[in-house]
Amino acid sequence: MKKFFFSLMAIALAVGTTLSASADNRTMPAEVQRLHDEIRAEFAPDKRVATFDVDYTFSDKNVMLRGQTTSIEAKNKLVITLRKMGYNVMDCIATLPDEESLNGKTLGIINLSTCALRSAPEYSAEMVTQALLGMPVKLIERDGWYRLQTPDGYLSWSSRVGVHPVTQQEYDAWNGAEKVIVTTHHSFAYKEPKADADVVSDIVGGNRLCYEGEKGKYFKVSYPDGRVGYILRSEAMRESEWRENLKQDAESIIATAKSLIGVPYLWGGTSSKGVDCSGLMRTSLFMHDIIIPRDASQQAYTGEHIDIAPDFSNLQPGDLLFFGSKATATRKERVVHVAMYMGGKRFIHSQGDVRINSFDPEDELYDPYNLGRLLFAARVLPYINKQPSLNTTATNPFYK
């Protein structure tokens, strides 16, 4: 067996017969391709929240498996099934998180007001989402940058300055500490409790810092990395008070969305500095302690599906509206945009900037383009904490 392993390794390195399991692969054994697709569909159907990337190197009935996955169950099922199919398997699949590259610290706390999270570990890569200061995350691997998973399940890459790695004990201490919640859209934390003091950092709505006391008009707060700052009490609330006053009704959430009118569209943005369409939904809801999936195509399959009547009479304020292209005989339905219904045929969304438009031809805000690509709606508010992907910081496992 050892001889086989060394021989196969030589083949892999010298001959280069590695095959990736992709839909258009013509040389992968059909039975292996089917198995790969079945396992991916079961354990990692959405690559934005789970990874199952495996390359196969074949020599007759010998196969070397290389790659990585976030699911040990997927890896085990692949190896066991291949062996049952008669293959001699050399398993070199890495299971994430990669504790070795992370030096054992597989948890972290976001350390910037708005941390840009990218599709690859480099500044030139696409920004796919953002994370907010104080947000707990899971660290997956380190390659100069940190690959991490946010509380909505999204996988992405952060620069080292964006996240503070912690032990389980430090993570639990952070989650258990009394917080100060930033409630203004944008401001600053200062080194001293006065407006002309030097700045520690900027802050945005939804940021969470540890409560360390009060001095005059200021909260004293601490950061994940131990820095200390002062935030105006008029721009934040203690978490206990914030929870007592928390409102999760449609009217309050729509008011928060309206307070972002004019904020520029930013691809990948999920903060008051800039939002994309789904980022506006996520930001507006998160300010009311509601966590929803990141992208419009993920948000579309939460809550209760609502078919839209011609007169829009079956819609309620707070419903999410989804836009895109309808299914055809050769193409699946595709969701590319999301908005929030306000009532009276009006909706708020981010397209160029955050704005209000209408489905009513008699309304000065009439938007025929989006009316023409309207698909369906989803009613999410009644399903908070009743569906796995709709939760709050009180129930989401990342915050425990």
Predicted regions: what is each one?
Residues 64-68, 240-244, 264-272:
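Second-shell loop/turn segments in exported
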Residues 76-101, 122, 150-184, 194, ...:
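Boundary regions of SH3-family modules and the immediately adjacent low-complexity/disordered segments
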Residues 165-168, 187, 194-197, 237-240, ...:
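Aromatic- and glycine-rich peptidoglycan recognition patches
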Residues 265-279, 283-317:
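Catalytic cysteine-centered active-site loop
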